[in-house]
Amino acid sequence: PDTLPEDPCYVAVLTNIMEHPADVIDFSNQKVVTNAAREILLISRSPIPYPKGTRDFEYEKVTGIQLYSKQALAFYHATPKSILEKAEENDMMRFIENGHKVHAIVSPYKTVSVDTPKDLALVNTILKEKQHG
């Protein structure tokens, strides 16, 4: 967004559009579903939304880059982990389950999360290609 919303407990995450079908079923990728205002409705490691009625949508994943207002950090510190946060291992669920909006901002730049040895190998390959390419 161009300006920060009125909510003093402001949280936003950077996302990327997923380009490869295999990434959608990879549990290390946290997928998001948003409403028309780009507020996150759900974050899951499962493929969401499930393509039962249509495949006319893009899967979006969390990059790991997050923005918190001072009030959001205070809320996070003072509030225990939520049920879905524990299940999905995603701290954004703490805000969502407690009624705070989390905004998703799609980045035009592709990012790589480094959460597994496979991710690290991919980053090393990318860096080698940049050095020699």
Located regions from the model:
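Conserved core of the sugar-phosphate nucleotidyltransferase
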Residues: P1-P80
